[in-house]
């Protein structure tokens, strides 16, 4: 997942930020009545909401961690890796493993950056089952730039599942779909994901979605992988997907 800034409560005003090679549209409708920002002592502005586990629980040695939370940081292949493990329920995020990767902005990366690619692939592979088909779900609205990461990613997935595909040695069966949004389909994300899982019976569901970040400078260079399922900060629980609801491991990226 790549973070975006949370929605603002500023009617009649759209904020456009540079992201990849196209602008981000921040929808001017708030999710809550309270302000979404707080002023820092240095005069800067910080968002209150975040989907990133390392922003919620801080860095090791800098903030006191609640019981049941472990945080570790490492650097590999030009990537700073922060691993957050939540071992109990009742905290700000569901129980599970969260891996945050900070790297050069994805807008300047290409296939030549093999160290970054291999590091990210290794972290994602560690969360997936060792074998079996994977269904990639591109979550989001392709018509809204800030929410289009999932559908755009699905367009680039190497699909190896299907009656006319030829098995590739060393690559597991992979299917990919962008289910759209409920306003366009009339179906919730849970309904569509459940139907696909029942039909395909994958070993795991990998959801690709945009994330909400509290720090504007993390737009672009930050990814998060998680094995706890898809749990956006939004109050709309019809977008939440996890193993308890679907019966298969659900990863978010």
Question: Model-predicted segments: where are they?
Answer:
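N-terminal amphipathic/basic leader segments beginning at the initiator methionine
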Residues: 44-96
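Glycine-rich phosphate/diphosphate-binding loop of Rossmann-like nucleotide-binding domains
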Residues: 141-172, 176
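An N-terminal, well-structured beta->alpha segment
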Residues: 86-129
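Gly/Ser/Thr-rich loops at beta-strand to alpha-helix junctions
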Residues: 139-149, 183, 210-214
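Short glycine-rich or small-residue beta-strand-to-loop segments that form or flank ligand, phosphate
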Residues: 100-104, 133-144, 176-180
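A structural-propensity feature for long, helix-poor, extended segments
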Residues: 172-197, 201
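Short terminal hydrophobic/aromatic SLiMs and anchors at protein ends
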Residues: 1-9, 20-28, 32-36
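A structural signal for small-residue-enriched, beta-sheet-centric alpha/beta enzyme cores
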Residues: 177-178, 191, 207-253
């Amino acid at each position: 997942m790549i973070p975006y800034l949370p929605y603002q409560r500023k009617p009649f005003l759209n904020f456009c930020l540079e992201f990849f090679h196209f602008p981000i549209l921040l929808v001017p409708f708030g999710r809550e009545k309270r302000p979404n920002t707080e002023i820092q002592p240095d005069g800067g502005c910080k968002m209150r909401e975040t989907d990133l586990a390392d922003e919620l629980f801080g860095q090791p040695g800098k903030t006191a961690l609640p019981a049941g939370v472990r945080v570790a940081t490492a650097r590999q292949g030009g990537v700073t890796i922060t691993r957050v493990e939540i071992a109990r329920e009742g905290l700000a995020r569901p129980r599970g493993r969260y891996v945050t990767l900070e790297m050069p902005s994805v807008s300047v990366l290409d296939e030549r950056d093999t160290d970054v690619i291999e590091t990210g692939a290794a972290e994602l592979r560690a969360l997936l089952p060792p074998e079996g088909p994977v269904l990639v779900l591109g979550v989001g609205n392709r018509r809204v730039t800030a929410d289009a990461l999932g559908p755009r990613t699905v367009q680039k997935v190497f699909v190896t599942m299907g009656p006319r595909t030829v098995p590739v040695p060393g690559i597991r069966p992979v299917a990919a779909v962008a289910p759209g949004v409920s306003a366009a389909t009339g179906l919730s994300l849970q309904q569509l994901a459940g139907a696909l899982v029942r039909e395909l019976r994958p070993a795991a569901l990998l959801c690709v979605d945009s994330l909400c970040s509290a720090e504007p400078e993390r737009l672009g260079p930050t990814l998060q992988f998680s094995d706890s399922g898809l749990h956006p900060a939004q109050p709309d629980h019809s977008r939440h997907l996890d193993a308890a609801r679907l019966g298969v491991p659900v990863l978010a990226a």
